[in-house]
From Swiss-Prot:
It holds the Pfam family Ribosomal_L5. GO terms for molecular function: rRNA binding; structural constituent of ribosome; tRNA binding. This is Large ribosomal subunit protein uL5. Part of the 50S ribosomal subunit; part of the 5S rRNA/L5/L18/L25 subcomplex. Contacts the 5S rRNA and the P site tRNA. Forms a bridge to the 30S subunit in the 70S ribosome. The lineage of its organism: Bacteria, Thermotogati, Thermotogota, Thermotogae, Thermotogales.
Length: 184
């Protein structure tokens, strides 16, 4: 398997778990919050009119994630947006296991430092159940994407799903994994 190098999972097991057990007073190792999945989504509005745009972004997302991206379809028709039910409206990929850990490692160490005018992630973007969402404005910050290949700059949403029950537990987990949050 090509995904054997997983430095973030080792860091989680050796450094993060003991710190979280001590800070939050967990008695069982299975109570400690962990990452479940990372969902990367690109909403491509122009894709409903131009199939080539959707396919190009699907290829880019596949390259970024290392896993085949799926094209999402509209669930219902919205006349104001000129969208009918079943039209292609975006691209997404769900990462779990070693691919997820490698993506998060790459995101924290390579991608976020390359973002222009980056001051840290917003610590208020948790959903109340321990999941964290944020957006990137362009796909050029990923090392796999070269500016010559892309036709159109497109942003993306990234959702990090954890088993944490509360936002403070999830935030501490992500801080220990290296996510750079803004100081409040």
């Amino acid at each position: 398997m090509a995904y054997e190098f997983v430095p973030l999972k080792e860091k989680y097991q050796k450094e993060v778990v003991p710190v979280l057990m001590k800070e939050f007073g967990y008695k069982n190792i299975h109570e400690v919050p962990r990452l479940v999945k990372v969902v990367i989504n690109m909403g491509v509005g122009e894709g409903s009119r131009n199939k080539d745009v959707i396919e190009a972004h699907a290829r880019e997302l596949t390259t970024i994630a290392g896993q085949k991206a799926i094209i999402t379809k509209a669930k219902k028709s919205i006349s104001n947006f000129k969208i009918r039910k079943g039209m292609s409206v975006g691209v997404k990929v769900t990462l779990r296991g070693p691919r997820m850990y490698n993506f998060v490692y790459k995101l924290v160490n390579l991608v976020l430092p390359k973002v222009r005018d980056f001051r840290g992630l917003n610590p208020n973007s948790f959903d109340g159940k321990g999941n964290y969402s944020f957006g990137l404005t362009e796909q050029l910050v990923f090392p796999e994407i070269s500016p010559d290949q892309i036709k159109r700059i497109q942003g993306m949403d990234i959702v990090v799903v954890t088993t944490a029950k509360r936002d403070e537990e999830a935030r501490r987990l992500l801080e220990l994994l290296g996510f750079p949050f803004k100081k409040q």
